[in-house]
């Protein structure tokens, strides 16, 4: 995929998901990529993943994480000097499963996240890839961020509520 992007003149990508591909992806054999790298002429900004306290990796996604998880992980990324925090998002995520009305739980989560980022502009810079200057690629990768198991439990309860009433 990265080679095809490079041949097409696309120099940035964010499709690498360590919670799915991990160390066997072929991007950096034997390493779980969590920080931007250069591979096949493309600067890969991997989706942010974290250990959810159960030993499993989970990707940062508006519908897959609670607001509390996202806020906490953003602060941890800042504290540990991570160069990027990439959140997976799909255009349909603000809709319910039937895709016929807004999913109020996710809409509220999105608004809270936007408000948090707006209040903390001095700490977090939100930007697209357009005009981004690639950093020197890391050949060593830090361990994924970690979220406590109680946040995972809170997310599971929130997701159960969302599926039942969302």
Describe each model-derived feature in a short phrase.
Residues 1-80:
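Active-site-adjacent pocket scaffolds in enzyme catalytic domains
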Residues 12, 64-166:
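C-terminal domain-boundary segment and adjacent tail
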């Amino acid at each position: 995929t990265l080679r095809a992007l490079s041949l097409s003149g696309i120099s940035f990508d964010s499709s690498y998901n360590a919670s799915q591909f991990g160390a066997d992806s072929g991007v950096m054999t034997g390493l779980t990529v969590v920080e931007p790298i250069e591979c096949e002429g493309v600067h890969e900004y991997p989706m942010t993943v974290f250990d959810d306290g159960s030993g499993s990796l989970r990707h940062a996604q508006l519908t897959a994480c609670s607001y509390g998880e996202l806020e906490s992980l953003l602060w941890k990324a800042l504290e540990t000097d991570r160069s990027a925090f990439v959140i997976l998002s799909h255009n349909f995520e603000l809709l319910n499963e039937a895709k016929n009305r807004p999913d109020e739980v996710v809409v509220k989560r999105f608004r809270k996240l936007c408000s948090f980022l707006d209040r903390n502009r001095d700490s977090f810079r939100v930007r697209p890839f357009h005009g981004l200057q690639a950093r020197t690629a890391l050949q060593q990768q830090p361990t994924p961020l970690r979220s406590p198991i109680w946040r995972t439990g809170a997310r599971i309860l929130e997701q159960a509520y969302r599926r039942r009433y969302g």
